[in-house]
Amino acid sequence: PPYHIIYMKIKEGFTLRDVCGEKVIIAEGLRNLNFSKLINLNESAAYIWNSLQEKEEFTDETIADLLCQEYEVDHATALADAQKLLAEWQEQGLVD
């Protein structure tokens, strides 16, 4: 089947914080009262999260491009990593 581009955006109400040297995403406000855990991010995921805050929407290609610009990684590897990260963020309810 043809490859379909899926546009996503980060849900409102989540903030990246530095907690005791760890990068974590936390839920803020009443909307997310049932959010019972912190989501840890490694350095590259935190870089991506911060970079995506400025974008209205993004795709796995957007993330792959960010990874290629910031780190010495080939596009195919970056795209695979981007797709894995987006799948995790979808599962955790961080992106639409």
Regions found by a protein language model. Give the residues of each.
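Long, charge-rich, low-complexity alpha-helical segments
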Residues: Y3-I6, K37-D96
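Acidic, low-complexity/disordered tracts enriched in E/D and polar residues
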Residues: P2-Y47
